[in-house]
Amino acid sequence: MPLEMDQKISKHTFGCQRSSTSDDDSGCAMEEYTWVPPGLRPEQVQLYFACLPEEKVPYVNSVGEKCRIKQLLYQLPPHDNEVRYCQSLSEEEKKELQMFSAQRKKEALGRGNIKMLSRAVMHAMCEKCGEKINGGEIAIFVSRAGPGVCWHPSCFVCSTCNELLVDLIYFYQDGKIHCGRHHAELLKPRCSACDEIIFADECTEAEGRHWHMNHFSCYECETVLGGQRYIMKDGRPFCCGCFESHYAEYCESCGEHIGVDHAQMTYDGQHWHATETCFSCAQCKVSLLGCPFLPKKGRIYCSKACSLGEDVHASDSSDSAFQSARSRESRRSVRMGKSSRSADQCRQSLLLSPALNYKFPGMSGNADDTLSRKMDDLSISRQGAGFDNDFWKARDEQETPEDHEEWAEHDDYMTQLLLKFGEKGLFQQAPEDNRSNEHWMSDNIKGKNDLQRNSRNQSLASKKYQSDMYWAQSQDGLGDSAYGSHPGPASSRKLQELDMDHGASGYMHEKMPWYKRSLECLSDNLKPQNENICDSMDSLALSNITGASVDRENKPRPSLFSYQNFQDLNTRDCEKMSNMGTLNSSMLNRSTESLKSLNSEICQEKPPPEEKPMHTSALRRSKSQTRPQVKFSDDVIDNGDCGSIDIRQPPMSERSRRRVYNFEERSQRPHHHRRRKSRKSRSENALHLATESKPSGRERNPRFYTAEDYEKLFHNRSAHEVQAYIQNADLFGQYPNAASNFGLPSQVVDKFLGLYGEDEDSWCSTCSSSSSDSEEEGYFLGQPIPKPLPQRYQYFSDDLCSPTNALSSSQFSQRTTKSKKKKGHKGKNCIIS
């Protein structure tokens, strides 16, 4: 019943039914089918077609009928058997075709026999699928394979194409059944162009297929490709010209055809010439052959920075952090009103300077001139004359129309700024003769000073190549605000970095950073004419592009250069970088390097022998110790005779952030018997070098000395004392780890020589072995004898081979006479063995 329903549905679906009653091989009238197996009864025919897929059943005017016709033409090609269906065979090939067809029919051709297995057969197996065929089921037997070999009706397929053998016609070869097409191909090659068997002796074989010699041609122009280059496209051969005109790809970079001779790179449907110019970064044009790349919006890039459109040529490898950090810090900057260019433009113009060496300013350009300028800035007369007047007021009064031809020729903004302001007020001091004060200088230094004086009349061409000096000035003098940076996250991170470095080794804090020497708590009118050579971190934090703060534009300008060893500049820690890519101003001007043997040529006189020398051990401090701080804070300054001082404080919104760092937790050792001070009060400017208060809490009022006091004291000294002091300066200049500010023969140090009459924490009992308790031994002609700052002697044990040889006892015989020292307060610079 289901079979009848299926037949009715099939008839209604295709809209027709068999009306002919022709006789078939079975001798039965099968009106429904175009073909039925021969020798079967109608019920057996129905059982056979029931085993086949529905689309393969050859119903009249059905899909199965069309499929049968198609398979007849494909599996049994007529041109494989009949000469009349062939196109261009020679007489010899025709004869060979006839012989070939007859041989196949004789040796391999056959038709399958459909039989119903008896119920007694128990072990029949399908040759194709290997499954058991039960008794009473339909099976197909092949006489050429033997009596016991059988297949399921649905498994009787060609061994090559797995298609049902049309009308059960097979060709048996080597134990397998094939359709007529694939059986012929087992014996002879077939032409891929004309689909005929190739009987000729020569043929063309390509891509695993065969062609007649004249049939292997271009699919478009039919040019014979035998022995020539060709390109296969969709199974069809093309000559190079036709392929390029119809199927060649276009390069995404240059837009030209990618020829067959050119290698190409393909990604996501895009094509490039496999060359360094075409397959390269779309932004920086660097070659990407053999390199990973970043695809974005149909283009390829070498990095994420290029994909974002950043100009990599405007920066170097150390500038990537600079760009990101400066963009955040630029919103916190205070710019000068005349500055119309952005901080990023200033940075780029400086980084692109041709002769720039920002790590070592004295190593590029004219190094001799740079050293001469440094030394001339440090001379006493220049410092005395350069800061007698208020600098910024003097600059405003002396400001004249600039020479356009001199500074306007520079594209570099920082060079324009320094040419415009530097030589006219910032770096130009009063041109008074200072040779009278150069008696303490060596011939080599004097020669360099003469060279500096002669170099003041340089032309503009020579100034163009002094970008190293301008860079150093912009870093030291103008501060970070020239690039739009004020204390913020960067400064905080730098302080944290210094804090962490201190925990590792005390070396960073043993050196004398330049920002430790400021007196911002004092008013501007009380500031002396020549400050210490180093500025403070706080004044740098409020400095704008001209070097003046927002509130304190009338602050005097400090000297720009540290008096350090010029030959050892490249071996020092000047390469410390801030977290924004530029030289950290707080690290650049370390004054621990001294100029070697400054007075070694002229200061060879020995002290009078009648003074008994006292061998004093070299003052050494361990690297974990930190420097004691001497600074007048706001609460200390308002007492005594300083209560009437008019202190000008900036508003709270513009004060730089300060952070207190206590290093007591970092390195506490039993022999460190001294008070520690936070970084907030760490300022060792020469103006602040007053004595510390006693443990009882009694505070001293600061004493201030003017230039007249200094000159009186200096001229009242005897030649012996001056010579001894000069030798001390020579001695401390020989060791690079000694603080350079002591050896510096500047007005800053000598002005306050009388400030250290009594310092109860300066020397410990072990270093001060004098038995004299007289109060008059520390004075000469009514003036206190100058004493060195104990905290300034930074000697490490590895730098001095012999403490006794390093410090002659005669030089310290006058400085160790004070015995009013409490034994409970050990010296800050001594190690108790």
From Swiss-Prot:
GO cellular component: plasma membrane
Keyword Oxidoreductase part of the UniProt annotation: no
Lipid-modified residues, S-farnesyl cysteine kind: 830
InterPro entries, alphabetized: LIM1_prickle, LIM2_prickle, LIM3_prickle, PET_domain, PET_prickle, Pk/Esn/Tes, Znf_LIM
Single Gene Ontology BP annotation: convergent extension involved in gastrulation
SUPFAM superfamilies (alphabetical): Glucocorticoid receptor-like (DNA-binding domain) (SSF57716)
Skewed-composition ranges (Basic and acidic residues): 432-453, 603-614
Region named Disordered: 1-22, 312-346, 432-456, 603-702, 767-786, 805-833
Domain of life: Eukaryota
Molecular-function annotations in GO: zinc ion binding
Domain PET: 14-122
Propeptide stretch(es), residue numbers: 831-833
Complex formation: Interacts with dvl2/dsh and mapk8/jnk1.
Reported function: Acts in a planar cell polarity (PCP) complex; polarization along the apical/basal axis of epithelial cells. Regulates the polarized assembly of fibronectrin on the surface of the mesoderm during gastrulation. Essential for gastrulation cell movements, cooperating with dvl2/dsh to activate jnk. Acts together with tes to control axial elongation.
Family per record: Belongs to the prickle / espinas / testin family.
Protein name: Prickle-like protein 1
